[in-house]
Amino acid sequence: MVDGKEVYISFNRWEDTIRHSFVSHLSAEFQRKGVSVFASEDSASDDRFAEESDAAIAKARVSVVIFSENFASSKGCLNEFLKVSKCRRSKGLVVVPVFYGLTNSIVKKHCLELKKMYPDDKVDEWRNALWDIADLRGGHVSSHKRSDSELVEKIVADVRQKLDRRGRIGVYSRLTKIEYLLCKQPGCIIRSLGIWGMAGIGKTTLARAAYDQLSRDFEASCFIEDFDREFQEKGFFGLLEKQLGVNPQVTRLSILLKTLRSKRILLVLDDVRKPLGATSFLCEFDWLGPGSLIIVTSQDKQVLVQCQVNEIYKVQGLNKHESLQLFSRCAFGKDVPDQNLLELSMKFVDYANGNPLALSICGKNLKGKTPLDMKSVVLELKRHLSDKIFVKLKSSYDALSVSEKEIFLDIVFTFRGANVDNVMQSLAGCGFFPRVGIEALVDKSFVTVSENRVQVNNLIYDVGLKIINDQSDEIGMCYRFVDASNSQSLIEHKEIRESEQGYEDVKAINLDTSNLPFKGHIAFQHMYNLRYLTIYSSINPTKDPDLFLPGDPQFLPPELRLLHWTCYPLHSFPQNFGFQYLVELNMPCSKLKKLWGGTKNLEVLKRITLSCSVQLLNVDELQYSPNIEKIDLKGCLELQSFPDTGQLQHLRIVDLSTCKKIKSFPKVPPSIRKLHLQGTGIRDLSSLNHSSESQRLTRKLENVSSSNQDHRKQVLKLKDSSHLGSLPDIVIFESLEVLDFSGCSELEDIQGFPQNLKRLYLAKTAIKEVPSSLCHHISKLVKLDMENCERLRDLPMGMSNMKYLAVLKLSGCSNLENIKELPRNLKELYLAGTAVKEFPSTLLETLSEVVLLDLENCKKLQGLPTGMSKLEFLVMLKLSGCSKLEIIVDLPLNLIELYLAGTAIRELPPSIGDLALLDTLDLKNCNRLRHLPMEMHNLNPLKVLDLSNCSELEVFTSSLPKVRELRPAPTVMLLRSKLPFCFFIFYEHRVTLSLYKARLQYIPEEIRWMPSLKTLDLSRNGFTEVPVSIKDFSKLLSLRLRYCENLRSLPQLPRSLQLLNAHGCSSLQLITPDFKQLPRYYTFSNCFGLPSHMVSEVLANAPAIVECRKPQQGLENALACSFCLPSPTSRDSKLYLQPGSSTMIILNPKTRSTLVGFAILVEVSFSKDFHDTAGLGFRCVCRWNDKKGHAHKRDNIFHCWAPGEVVPKINDDHMFVFFDLKMHPSILFEGDVFGILADLVVFEIFPVNKQEMHVGDSCTITKCGVYVINDAAGSSSGNTMTPQCSSMDSLKLLDGKGKKRLRVNYAGLKQREKALFLYIACLLGGEKADLLAQFLASTDFVIESTLEDLAGRYLIDISSNGEVMMPPLQRNFSREIIHMLPASTKELVSMASGSPCNRNNDVFVSFHGKDFRKQFISDFLKKLVYKGIRICIGDKILSRSLINKVIKESSIAVVVFSENYASSSLCLLQLMEIMKCWEELGQVVMPIFYKVNPSDIRNQSGHFGKGFKKTCKKTINDERQRWSRALTDAASIAGECSLNWASDADMIEKVANDIRKKLISSKKLGKQIQRVDCDHDNPWETEFNKCIERFFQLPYDGNHDESLVSLTTEKVIDMKQTLKEIYQITKVKLKNNLVGRRHINNICFMHILYEKCEERSSFNPTSLHTLYDNGIPYQVYTKRKKHMSGEEKAPIGGCVGCFYMGQNQGITKAGGGRTMPTAYPAAPQANQGYNAGAQPYPPTAYAV
């Protein structure tokens, strides 16, 4: 019986070419990753093996099916595949297809040939099984562009991820990152890793998972939970005894030397909070054996830094999918919640923000609860943080210092999401040291700084608020932080008595006036310590707050640092208000007409924002703010002038956008960075040509930066300055890089351009021709935008000189006819809407790198040139609307999107079947297209195929590829009235089907053959009814019947339906609704035939509608159902509506007790031209007062159409009906259904678009009404009382800018763009952009995207002098990506630097063969990297001098002999150098004979000899003899031969282990000395280094118990002589303090060795090595110091390595290895020399 394995590998086991290579590597990789695997490698085909195979498949969780070239040649293989397919369908077996050496289409061709091969067998079953497996998504395909090892890595990663879905959620992806961080560290040293993250983020879980996976590779391992407590209770020896079984009776020294140092130990210290204990403990463990691993977890990054870990991994929160899976598992016991509970679950997921602890606690709190109970949990969570979560996070807060706590609470209450520089300035004004405090909070995971803003996690934020409230209660400072919830007693009274207590303690006020429960006065006379004042309205930012200001001019507190007051109601500031402490003043949309008047002490003021203050006339006072940095006056329409700010040297930003009365260029200082003048009234800049003004402006713009980029860029924007008609000579602005004159409709000419210009925007200008200077002098231009320049007729000659131009936009240039020349490096070319008649074939070579070509709506274009297939990088071709385009000869092979809608083509080229990457093909409105080529059937599944309105199309299913979304027209002319039966069979598994405008006269019942449909579009057809069988579509979610004008009735619809859109069905009269299963969105707009009583009927069944929706909603918090239909109010007198957009209802106690929800009716009148593409919805605000008179409100947005639906054009008045459950009493009244004053509720309704912005006057609410829905009493009409208030002001919500994350930007790159980014990451250290481009152009790398594009994605920076830089954040990100790449890819990227090997490589690998490299070599190199061995690959080195250098610097040379090795003269040159180092330097050489006999190498015979002779024909006889001798000598060295191994993977493991052992032995000696680069100006330093190098050529096998390998007498004498030379060279220098710090360590160490040797009668190398390993007695060191300085010192016993000294109060780590006492003074500086009289400084040469 076969034991159950996790993975079963199925392949043709008689195919030896993959059984002993690819499959063996795949099996070995699975086992190395801890995944049990069964591979059917036994070549026997008896019944017993078949039984074992079937049993293994049945027990496996994942099956990897390998399609190789001869997979169909074995019946056993086919039967195995059939078994896998059956288990997939019956038992849910996860199947991963792998196409090795062939593609999906070739597999299908083999399937068609099975009948010929096996005429009498079960061919049909085999074929179906093979098709089933081959069509699975997520398959892996081998490619000549990547190695087998990379393919193996991807397969194993994919399988592990699939296995991880059932295990610990999110652990696998994070373990992968940890593995690569560990692989960065050489395997022969003591590796260390820190795991850092906030409390509850999963640090312990991740450390435990890493421990479980890695512990099998170590001789001993221990996991110490809660390290601080364990170490305090048990101490060092107690932990050793408990965790590692060390006998405490043994002395410390013997433990370190005999027990620990000889073992590879895995040590995990979990939850380290205090660094002292951990550093002490780890210092003792510094004597662990090579290859040991230490993992430390902590919430504080500085703890990990003090523990001196080599790498730190920051644990990120779970993503949305992982969070939902964890929450659902904890709450509902399954990985995915029910659909009706999805929205509820996502609320918890969003709140937890990826924190596993919060997700699990919230999930467990919901376990076993009903949906109604779950609602209460949500409300409780919104009001009160869970105690379990709070206790866990509060302990971290308690560990903060006092100032850190203060800064944290200020950030939580006032500065969350604010600019970090602004926050630090405000905090500094309060006496804090903000930079230190914020950095400490970041290190302790309390705050993060993202995109230069201070962010606080939701959980941490709630903890901070709870601490504020609790702390206030404890210390009696209940008013220290004031918001809308506790502001009434402070603000609502007109007078405040001085005797009142608490006012002086108020530190911050944060008032959202839309939430104020009262209207009253606001006064601040006694709030002497108020520092932060923020007043705003979240609902309507432009509405005046309901606050009244007293007449006292001193109403503003004097200690204010931050004043933010939206819609400030007064016309000026009080004269007596002091600004001496104010750092930031924000008053957007204020009523100010002037500022404070006169002069004020404004030295502290940094920023002022008065945007949209439309009454503001003058701001001259700002010129007296010496330290101001930002002035924002955008939208101040009445502002007529801007003061002279030339003397304000700190001013960086000035924004005068849309200040239309500003007529002249403002006077700003040279320090300006951003100057926004868009939409101003500036008419002329010609005056800048005179005097020094132009020079000043040039200086001003030298430091202008883009708003979203860190790198410095010179920008001048005058966009939409429609009055601007003339310009000065722009050449004078030499530093400009971005010039934007878009929309300057009167601008006809520009005299010249700056040479450094990179982006030029001239769209919608009156320019008639492109200036020739642009082509000949502006060589750095990257983007030129001249869209809609209707006067432009042609392009100038010389465009090819613009070698960096990547984007050229000429769309809308309707008079542009001829294009004779284009830049050679274009990536994007836009010519849509131009008058071009032909596309010259001569331009194809110029456009060889183009990625996007847009020729849409070129009405005169008649054809494309032959040779389009040469555009190998073109991925998007747009030809839609080219109505004269009839013929396309060929197409680029790498096309992804092809748009041919509305063209006159009659047929597609047969080559379209070769477009393997094509996923979108648009052929709609191709009225002359008659048929599709048969080759299209070979295409991979398309995402979209649009054949709408192809009226002449005659072929349908026989040539169509598989497609996810099909929008076809009916095909054969005779069948236009219906669809053929074969259509339904061919597309039976389709999920989306569009038959838009297919001219169907009726829908056949055969549509039932498509039961998997989720989306069905039958719009614009001629049928009169929908088949009754539509109700059986159990998965159908969306049904569109728009403009089916003949449709008269609708049958009962599927219960799964969520959307029904029947807009424009003018004949529709009868529907058969099931009120218990209505769609969520019901659209009958422009259906004027519907009966008038339909709304009344719907309202009568409202309780049934709501009741059926409640289980699906899970919580009563969302839209239950919505209707849209022509207004029936004129025909239905039963409806009770109130004129206007607001209404009131009365809820009596009986009604409130059974309240379920509300039905909201809105009648809307649309303008004739209404067609709002931004969508339409209604914002409903519900207001009421509680018994105490406090006001409350709730609001909700109702969308009229489902997301993604097209907004139709609506005629006449329409009514919208919404059934809402969000206003349920437990939500609306916070659980108290009787807490409403006078039973009165007010509803206000506003029309908004999908961005929740007011839609304007295009639609008007004429009537509205609210119906109450009760459990038992049915629906009762709302009261028709006159509303107290009319509709609210227009709602404006700021559309927040989305976060730009590096990972999102990187993921959006194409494959070659990603490669370019990684190349730059390896290359850059301040290279000029043009040099970098030249370097990349000289390689075989094709730049898919320009450097400017990468800069636009914030992945790189381009400095003002053209250097390409990568900031630390991006660089760390690139390193993370590189380390996550497969080994072969990392190796390729590393070659970008031009030096293919790092210095002092461990192993040099020589081999030959590209295909051979993909297979054996890639696996071999990956194994070496995993072992922590630094490698250099010989086939990337072309320079002979570099070959010699690299080989000499390598410790071991590995020569992989294959049959074609001697076919390369480069390999033979490498071999000669290797054998030379073997003879002269004793370098270790390890040959590997891969599928070749060693005797053929020695004798140069066989196939190997033929290649050798062929190579020798091109060289002289002497060279040939040297090659032959090198081959003979190398083949005589003992090595591994693949012919003696059954599996390549086993041989690779053996060789890698041998290499690692040899490296550890060779590094025992060399690690004692730190190599120091010598100063060539000092000859003695050069001689000193030469002596050290010559001395350490001593061979050593690493055995402590046996003597060293035999040494000749001459060698020993030479070693002693070398020591003597070193002593003589450095003695005088050291005595006279002439030695710099970098040499002290080596010199001191060598002196000790020399004196030790002199004390002995004979020189014993074995004793010398023992001396190295165990450390040198400290008294020898002090003796030397005594001899050198003459100062007497008492000898201190013990060993320096162990530090048994008197001064061992603190121990810190030196370098990356051994320890040194902190009691020693710091080493002298480089220029100070060595003070012989100072306290001894121990040589760090001991540190490894």
Curated annotation (Swiss-Prot):
It is an enzyme of class 3 (hydrolase). The active site is at residue 80. The keyword Nucleotide-binding applies. Its EC number is 3.2.2.6. GO terms for molecular function: ADP binding; ATP binding; NAD+ nucleosidase activity, cyclic ADP-ribose generating. This is Probable disease resistance protein At4g19520. It comes from Arabidopsis thaliana. LRR repeats lie at residues 503-526, 557-581, 583-602, 603-626, 648-669, 670-692, 710-733, 734-754, 755-777, 779-802, 804-823, 824-846, 848-871, 892-915, 917-939, 941-963, 987-1010, 1011-1035, 1037-1059, 1062-1086. Keywords: ATP-binding, Hydrolase, Leucine-rich repeat, NAD, Nucleotide-binding, Plant defense, Repeat. Signal peptide: none annotated.
